[in-house]
């Protein structure tokens, strides 16, 4: 089976042929993504202050609160994460042969997040401490690359 056929199978099924480690680690990843998605979507601050430790921005009396706009976008990001997560859960339930494609999406998404942080950098005064996402991006990218490679391997029989 070619690399293209493994990444984009002609038919989705539960017949996963890759290394089981990639499957188990993906289950751990979606557990982490579940927490992250619900936190961003449901928390009053979208996790912006409580987890990412971005400061609460001051505003003048009678002026609109800029924090509400930030919280809105955090919640919108959370909704997008939950939609992605639903696809991940469906694939783990019914279409496990799409696991290499799912790992590829993680391999693409993490550098895009890192690029967004580079294009719109926030310096130290914006944070109370280094946010978890900033610390975890590189390790997550490395793990995702390894898991993508493992998911493309054929199972040993």
Regions found by a protein language model. Give the residues of each.
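Aromatic-anchored segments of alpha-helical transmembrane domains
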Residues: 33-35, 107-117
